Amino acid sequence: MSSAKTFTKHISFDDLAPSLIDDQATIIKNDSHHVGLNNHFLHIPPQFNPVYKNTLTGSHGSNDLATDESLDSPEDEEASSPLQLGTPTSTTSGVPHFYTQVFSPAAHDPSKSYLRSPSVERSRSESPMFRSRRRTSVRLPPPPKVSVLKKSRKAADEQGPIDDIDIGDLDFELERKMTKMTERNTQKNSGSRKGYTQAAFANLNEVEDRIETKSMVDLSESENMESSKKRSKSFAGMTDEELAKLEEFYISKGRSNKTKIDQFDFGEQVPVYLNTTESKTDSSNVTDPLAAIYPSRPTIVHNAISMTIDHPDYENYISNTKEKLNCKDKDDDVDLRVVSCYISGRRYTWSSVDWYVENLTRNGDHLVIITTIPEFEAKIDTLAYKEKRRHRLERMTSNTSESMTTASHSLIGPDLSSPLSTGIRIEAIHNEAKQTCSDILNYYARRLATKIVRISIEMVKENSTRSAIISATSLYRPSLQVISTVSANIQIKFRNGKVKLPFFLMKHFAMPAFVVPFEFIKPELLIKPRVDKDEQDNSDDLKTEVRKKERLQWLSALIRRTLENPFTKHKVVDSDDEESDSDESVTSVNEYFPISPEKKEEMEFFDKMGYVRPKPSRQVLLDDNTLMKYDSSGRKLTPIESRNSRRSSKRSSRIQFNNNGIYKVKSMVDDIYNHETASTPHIKTALKWDNEDPKMKFTSHPMRKTKSAGLSPRTSSTSSSSGQRKAHHHHHHHNHVSRTKTTESTKSGNSKKDSSSSSTNDHQFKRSEKKKKSKFGSIFKKVFG
């Protein structure tokens, strides 16, 4: 374990609002606003800005400018010092604040134009024309103390020293040195990074090259003229021998069914090259294949803030590890493993980074924290438009005197709906975003102080979370990703057609994904770990690690508490009489005080699963009064409010049940019985109903039961018992019908069963007729009575 060291800044990019300065300059130009000397967005050179305070001399820029110009002209020595109307007034914070601001009414007042006139520093004893001509020679700002430029004594086009080599007396070492020097110069002139090629010298346009090209062109033209002067010989002037040779030549070139290999002239064939020739019209063909080829469009197309900090030993650890592993520079990957985690303003999303810090981190990792920020420029513009419209409506509805008072107040204070105020809002959000990224980096740097890792945060300006994660993933190419969820049931689809983010990442990204439920991490230990009383004063919450022993004790206590049956509180009785008496007393008490459906559901769950369902960690967190809980609007939450709130999730993501409590009819239940057990209605199959309640015979799922609200407990219990007897009798009747159908299908029925089945059919027909007759009357009673 390496000692904790301070992380160092690596590389940071800020592209969250790149067009802020240009937009503000365009607004000032189009609206003809006054450009003050201390404009917040435009940089005025210090030689023209009297607000600029020179750090070297400790005086203002206007005094320095007047002093330098007084040395050039003897006229200025007799002149009085310029009128200091533009001296800055220091505020309570010590920051110079020039009173000719953009929002000040004096900036737009024509009667006070002298405040922004460039002649405030001009002396009365000299000509304004001469002074303005002298001002064209500007003075540069003071140079830095340490120059970043390398000093070189030779000129830019001056050649370096050349070693003289006597080629008359060459030995092996000298020849080898000359060969290396020639190759190095050729590679430098070719423009290639690795190796060299002569293709870069094909487009030279020197004098000797032009002369040589012209001579080659003249030679080719003369050859073409000579060949054109030669005319082909006619057949009339040929001899018989020439005609015979010409005939043989045509026969060898033509197509014939009777070709002879001895008559084929191989010397007249077009040469065939086996290597592939590149097309000259191919646009991808470059002069130097080893030269650097840059993409025609940018790789990073999203606006974001990217900050990175490294452990001081990170680079050395990576290089040493790669040397041990014999890694080849195929992909030019600097990091050994890149892990990405997504966080947002929702608290449960931070469980992904917390789980990585506690369980997955190792030396050489590159942790990339991805977060998003919406398109705040458009939202600020919409907000400014609404404020401007509201002020306009208030001005129209108010009286004349009130409108004059409002107009006078608007001149004194800045207009929040103006474009300049909008730019200040955008810059404030930008600065707050940078500060938030810095705080997140410092927080996890303190938690990972003992690990040699690199931490990066990428805040993408995007309204869509999916697009932001896609852009950041294509940029960093992580080896694995950790995502958190509030529910373990991630394969669900919402009413608006969207799916959960973990399911989207697991389905569409070709990389390992760790899905961390928020309830599996105890929030109390992550917020503030337990420490001893002696160490409480000298310990820090961020540096204190959660002890493994405390975690195991908490899990053991949870398992022990959930395995105890809280519903068996009566004592075990030895004799049968006492047991029967206790059962009768329990049943009598249950008749007067029936068990609630929630309690009965808990008892059935314990009989089925064998343990008590534990509370979710969110509920435990809300039940703890020592912690402060707030909602999105900043209001403090209580356990009752959090359970009744619309945004709170009432489902338990830890346990999934198959018990849905649906209604089932007889047609859905008949398949459970087999023909062997149909004759014994009270005996259940050993495969299905060994451990179930005898009252529930049709399905393994509990039936929904309705109870009249107007009855007393004793009446309701009596009616329920009579209902059970009727249901029991009806159950015997249906079993008898099923046995009748079975005997009819096997053709082994008797007359007694046939008579019972016929009577049953008649009884069912009468009931259906009676139901049809009473249907209209029941509807009439429901509507009118």
Curated annotation (Swiss-Prot):
GO terms for cellular component: cytoplasm
Leader peptide range in chain numbering: none
UniProt region (Disordered), positions on chain: 53-162, 571-590, 631-657, 693-785
The name this protein goes by in its record: Uncharacterized protein YGR237C
Keyword rRNA-binding: no
Source superkingdom: Eukaryota
Misc remark: Present with 1050 molecules/cell in log phase SD medium.
Residue stretches of biased makeup (Acidic residues): 66-79, 575-584
Amino acid composition bias (Polar residues), ranges on this chain: 53-65, 81-94
Organism: Saccharomyces cerevisiae (strain ATCC 204508 / S288c) (Baker's yeast)
Modified residues (Phosphoserine): S215, S667
Disulfide bonds: none
Key word Transferase present: no
Ranges of biased composition (kind: Basic residues): 725-739
Annotated Low complexity bias: 776-785
Keywords annotated in UniProt: Phosphoprotein
